[in-house]
Amino acid sequence: MIKSSKIVIIGGGIVGCSTAYHLANLGLEVCLIESGKLTAGSTWHAAGLVGQLRTNANITQLLGYSVDLYDKLEKETGLSTGWKMNGGLRLACNKERWQEVLRQTTTAHSFGLEMELLSPKEAQDLWPIMNIDDVFGAAFLPTDGQANPTDISQALAKGARNKGAKIIEETKALKVVVEDGVIIALETDKGTIQCERIVCCCGQWTRQFAQTVGVNVPLVSFQHQYLVTEKIDGVESNLPTLRDPDRLIYFKEEVGGLAMGGYEPNPLSWAEKSVPDNFHFSLLDSDYDHFEQIMNNALGRVPKLETAGIKELINGPESFTPDGNFILGESPELNNFYVGAGFNAYGIAAGGGAGMALAEWV
């Protein structure tokens, strides 16, 4: 166990690993500790879509950075990442949504993000098995893609190690030691690490850990489900990811079938007071009744789902924030205590850019 490190990152999901990677690339002394194994929280069960288009221009730029990073990471580290730049479709099914897409196109082009406007038929040419009866138009981002969340994280961790970062698994953070308002150490169950700065990337555990030093992180865990189908005729390996915000659903190709999930208007919270310490590589029980509303929306878009075999329905809790934006930066309550959490189920897309931004702040 090391005795000191200028910077300690708590949490070995994709955001923690990305932050370690970027800090190490800046030549800074950094140690990452993870209470279980890397990706054991919510990273391992994420669907893995990597889309760049958001209503916020700054976030869109961070997501664009993630794409650039993931595109080179496998070559840099020698580890497979599952990264596939198959493009992403975003549907608009009414005039209001179409106007939003037009505004986003202008924003995207202003900082060099490639984005094409498509007719319903052109969108269907890229995604042949979807119904377009209610589609007003679509946006296509050819540099969107998908990745294997665990593999991406392991590649980031290797890249960090290659630049001198220390990564220590199965080590639980217990207490931040503060003297006269200054962070001086982090106590763990394996010993104390003298440090100057702490970056809290604990995912769903962030709120409860940050509270121990008086830092408020407004996030809560919600159940988030997606299903994985058997092979479906017409689903090719290069099928773009698909987002349908008016139906609150998304799709990606998964070994010749589809992964499909969505966002219920009445989501179910989980572990509101405290996320269990040992919730590692764990899932919640599938809730087919609650998923029915998402499934009905998806059937309207992809009728072939009605006869598709279902491999599994994955119910993995994710952390969400009140405004739908992630929480990133130095806490106002404690100097040199940084937070990267609350990624609202798009942490894989945000991970590369969020880690870069955190590293530059730290």
Predicted regions and their residues:
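Dinucleotide-binding Rossmann-like beta1-alpha1 core, especially the glycine-rich loop
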Residues: 48-126, 248-251, 255-257, 278, ...
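Helix-loop-beta segment of a Rossmann-like dinucleotide-binding subdomain
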Residues: 81-90, 104, 120, 124-163, ...
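Flavin-dependent oxidoreductases
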Residues: 18, 53, 176-287, 293-305
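Short beta-strand to alpha-helix junction loop
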Residues: 61-64, 91-100, 140-158, 168, ...
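N-terminal Rossmann-like FAD-binding beta1-loop-alpha1 element of flavoenzymes
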Residues: 5-31
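Glycine-rich FAD pyrophosphate-binding loop
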Residues: 24-44
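Helical element adjacent to the flavin cofactor pocket in flavoenzyme catalytic cores
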Residues: 139-197
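C-terminal catalytic lobe of FAD-dependent flavoproteins
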Residues: 149, 246, 285-362
